[in-house]
A protein has these predicted regions:
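Long amphipathic alpha-helical coiled-coil segments
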Residues: 242-257, 283-292
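Peripheral, non-transmembrane regulatory/ligand-interaction domains of membrane transport proteins
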Residues: 1-246, 251-253, 262, 266-273, ...
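Hydrophobic alpha-helical transmembrane segments and their immediately adjacent juxtamembrane loops
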Residues: 2, 7, 265-360
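Short hydrophobic alpha-helix at the HAMP-DHp boundary and the N-terminal turn of the DHp
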Residues: 213, 220, 253, 260, ...
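Short acidic-hydrophobic sequence patches enriched in Asp/Glu that either
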Residues: 153, 255, 259, 333-337
Length: 360
């Protein structure tokens, strides 16, 4: 299980951002070059442009008459990320949280700002689960999203702006935040449902003892790891999400509060799904062990039957193998054939008897 394919050759394991410092660095595994794009929209206009990371000021691009959405893709340029955070009134420690993928999920509310740090989970085309660190900074009419890679995570949110879904171009930045969170939560819902579906497929396979179950143990372990990733990313988010419903800084207005309630319901669905996955995994482990015991019992049963058939044959062979001088059977003309016939008759009789008793 890995975060993405874009893995830095040194994996930045020497960077932890665990201590107080004047400057922090990106501590993740992606090697995506930092790019910044700015989408500005209002009732009448919508346009997007690229911004250089070495700009002396990012605040100068803000249009007070529009919603300004900065998309920062790639966190390798930690200096640019820190400057953006500082310029919009946040502390260096907030930059540390953004640059540290190992940071816990949190929603931090200030007087005029809000910082959301979380992780998104999704399956790629190879059906491998990926986890990506995402942060969202919102202040007034400015929304800044930070992603580790250049994957189009928020493509659906941009399309919603283009089509003016739910009158987003007439609303404040709180509705844009709702669309961004909806994209992340939708990925978690899809991932959790996919894991549950795959676990149910494994269960159907295990219930049919005739199926080949050679790699089922490894498959269960793999699905368990995927479940743990989703649970790790969703459980803390659900606990923190209540802060958004109680916020009083004006970012989330009363007219869009039902949307956030719906997002909370989706998170609750994810929690319920992961709980279901946990129970299924527990039962699958028991079922897998039980099936292994049944297969071992079946093997021992076959070996016992074979041994039982050969016990009387061994007895007969032992008698005729004794070296007594007075054994008339040894001098019979048809003694050898009679011995073979008796052995076959004994073996067949034993087999028929066990078959009649339904022992196999």
């Amino acid at each position: 299980m890995r975060r993405r394919e874009y893995v830095h050759p040194h994996k930045r394991k020497h960077i932890s951002n665990r201590h107080l410092a004047d400057r922090y660095f990106y501590a993740g595994e992606h090697d995506t070059v930092t790019r910044i794009s700015l989408t500005q929209y209002n009732t009448d206009t919508l346009h997007t442009r690229e911004i250089k990371t070495n700009e002396t000021s990012f605040k100068k691009f803000v249009d007070e008459n529009s919603i300004n959405w900065f998309q920062v893709s790639g966190l390798t340029d930690s200096e640019a990320v820190t400057r953006i955070v500082n310029e919009f009134g946040m502390h260096n420690l907030d930059a540390k949280d953004i640059l540290t993928p190992q940071h816990v999920v949190k929603i931090e509310e200030y007087d005029k700002h809000m910082l959301i740090v979380l992780n998104s989970s999704y399956y790629d085309t190879n059906m491998e689960i990926n986890s990506e660190h995402i942060s969202i900074l919102i202040t007034g009419n400015v929304v800044i999203s930070f992603t580790e890679s250049n994957n189009p995570v928020f493509e659906k949110a941009y399309k919603a702006i283009e089509s003016d879904m739910l009158n987003i171009r007439r609303k404040n930045s709180g509705l844009l935040l709702a669309f961004l969170l909806n994209t992340i939560i939708a990925n978690l819902v899809e991932s959790a449902s996919k894991v549950e579906e795959m676990l149910e497929d494994i269960e159907e396979t295990l219930l049919d003892i005739k199926n080949d179950q050679g790699n089922m143990g490894l498959l269960i372990q793999q699905r368990r790891k995927e479940y743990m990733v989703i649970r790790k990313n969703s459980q803390p988010l659900k606990e923190q999400f209540a802060k958004l419903l109680r916020t009083e800084n004006g970012i989330i207005s009363s007219d869009i509060l039902p949307i956030y309630n719906d997002l909370s319901d989706q998170l609750q669905f994810i929690i319920q799904t992961t709980e279901s996955c946990r129970e299924i995994i527990s039962s699958l482990v028991d079922l897998y062990i039980s099936n292994n015991d049944l297969r071992m019992n079946a093997i021992m049963k076959r070996l016992t039957i074979v041994s039982t058939i050969f016990i009387p044959l061994t007895f007969l062979a032992g008698i005729w193998g004794m070296n007594f001088k007075m054994m008339p059977e040894l001098d019979w003309q048809y003694g050898y054939g009679i011995a073979w016939s008796l052995m076959l008759l004994t073996a067949i009789s034993t087999w028929l008897y066990m078959r009649k008793k339904d022992w196999f």
